[in-house]
């Protein structure tokens, strides 16, 4: 049995506008000029960057700043986050092919169901896995290992858009597909790069 594991933001869900608006609303409150959307998106997808320092000039953000960010992000995420074109159809094809489908996101586990249901794709996933105290964020491979164990699959492939995703797949010794329709750029080290869902489907079908 095959399992196809999908990252969420930048792969299934386009949350770029929500992230962009949140960062710049916080910056506005700190009397800072807005940042370019492309810079913000690239920064959040690269491991090891001090985002508080780069976005707000603060080395260690206060609890109130963190809470303010989370509150604003939830608001904008609910307003702006949508599925990328063709992704729902891709998930349906996986379902019709009798593949198991799992979502593995660095977002907190308790926030995932709402956005997936809003975009009418929640029921297409066999398992939904988010970060929690017990499950570390990618690039740790724990989520991918959990996806395999929960579905009992003998073969697995991970579809994502960032270096964190690619490293997570590498750490799990799993084939990886880098999508370039969202936040992601072509990876020189990924086994597969895809520009659209048709290309993604060909790889998923034949791995």
Residue ranges, per PLM feature:
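N-terminal helical cap/lid subdomain that shapes the substrate entry/recognition surface
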Residues: 2-89
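Conserved Lys-Pro-Asp/Glu-containing loop-to-beta segment of HAD-superfamily phosphomonoesterases
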Residues: 3, 137-166
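A short, structured active-site edge motif that brings together acidic residues
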Residues: 40, 122-137
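Short, acidic loop-to-helix structural element flanking the phosphoryl-transfer center
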Residues: 75-103, 109, 113, 138-141
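Surface-exposed amphipathic alpha-helices with a cationic face
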Residues: 88-96, 148, 166-170
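Glycine-rich phosphate-binding loop signature in dinucleotide/nucleotide-binding domains
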Residues: 96-99, 150-154, 207
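Acidic, Mg2+-coordinating phosphoryl-transfer loop and its flanking beta/alpha structural elements
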Residues: 157-192
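Short acidic-hydrophobic, aromatic-tinged amphipathic segments that line or gate anion-handling sites
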Residues: 192-200
């Amino acid at each position: 049995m095959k399992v196809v594991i999908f990252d969420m933001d930048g792969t299934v869900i386009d949350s770029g506008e929500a992230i962009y608006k949140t960062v710049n609303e916080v910056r506005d409150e700190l009397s800072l000029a807005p940042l370019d959307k492309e810079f913000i998106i690239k920064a959040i997808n690269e491991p090891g960057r001090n985002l508080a320092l780069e976005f707000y000039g603060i080395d260690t953000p206060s609890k109130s700043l963190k809470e303010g960010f989370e509150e604003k992000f939830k608001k904008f995420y609910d307003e702006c986050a949508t599925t990328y074109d063709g992704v729902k159809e891709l998930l349906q094809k996986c379902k019709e092919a009798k593949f198991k489908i799992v979502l593995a996101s660095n977002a907190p586990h308790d926030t995932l169901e709402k956005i997936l249901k809003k975009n009418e794709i929640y029921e297409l996933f066999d398992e939904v896995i988010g970060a929690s105290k017990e499950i570390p964020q990618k690039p740790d491979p724990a989520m991918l290992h959990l996806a395999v164990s929960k579905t009992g699959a003998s073969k697995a492939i991970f579809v994502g858009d960032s270096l964190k995703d690619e490293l997570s797949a590498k750490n799990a010794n799993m084939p990886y597909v880098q999508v370039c329709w969202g936040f992601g750029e072509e990876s020189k080290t990924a086994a597969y790069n895809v520009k659209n869902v048709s290309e993604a489907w060909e790889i998923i079908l034949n791995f």
